[in-house]
Design a protein with these regions (language model features):
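Histidine/acidic-residue-rich, glycine-tolerant segments that coordinate divalent metal ions
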Residues: 41-46, 63-71, 75-76, 82, ...
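Acidic/His- and Gly-rich active-site-bordering loop/insert found
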Residues: 1-96
Length: 196
């Protein structure tokens, strides 16, 4: 973390940072692909025979912001994710799970994860996890594929005959949202669900 903080590199230019992370993983016995996924500062590190039932990608972020360094905390997030991958690799047999550490650069701009998804990099993983800092001391888990969001619609009452233009019909807004979701649903692939 200290090395990354002392050598901030902006999105897509994380050459020394990615090199340091890869060197650390190699020193711990990981085999690495570097560069990876067509990105000069990305990597994938695999520990052991890679023959367990499940596969987990531990994602690391390590880019800095222009002019202000690691204000988003990727120096810590990346280091913690790296250490989590190293620690989990020691119990792969008990978990029946292969642990792969995947470097995801350029998260403050384009977001390398999006391009990696489009390339199918994550298709063979059962789960992808990562650490990111927050302004509170807590553990927070969100499964984006299983998110449930509640929307509340509020209207404004008015007299239907004397001044309907002063009112706001919450049901109209709710119906527009439901119709919009229904239009999007037709574009979803079979492995995605969008319910309303």
């Amino acid at each position: 973390s200290d090395y990354i903080a002392d050598h901030p590199e902006v999105s897509g230019e994380e050459y020394e940072t990615s090199k340091k992370l890869v060197e650390t993983l190699r020193a711990k016995g990981f085999e690495t692909e570097y560069p990876f996924a067509g990105l000069e500062t990305s990597f994938r590190a695999i520990y052991g025979p890679n023959d367990h039932k499940y596969k987990v990608a531990v994602l690391t972020e390590y880019d800095a912001l222009p002019g202000i360094g690691h204000a988003c905390g990727h120096n810590l997030s990346g280091a913690i994710s790296l250490l989590a991958g190293i620690a989990a690799s020691g119990i792969q047999d008990e978990l029946d799970c292969d642990i792969h550490v995947v470097g995801t650069p350029a998260e403050e701009t384009d977001g390398a994860k999006c391009g990696m998804c489009n390339q199918g990099i994550f298709k063979n993983y059962d789960m992808a996890i990562m650490v990111h800092l927050y302004d509170q001391n807590l553990v927070y888990c969100r499964l984006n594929g299983l998110s449930c969001i509640q929307y509340d619609f509020y209207g404004k009452a008015s007299h239907a005959g004397a001044s309907p233009w002063e009112g706001r019909n919450a049901l109209n807004a709710a119906m527009l949202m439901i119709h919009g979701l229904d239009c999007i649903r037709g574009c979803c692939t079979p492995d995605s669900r969008l319910n309303s």
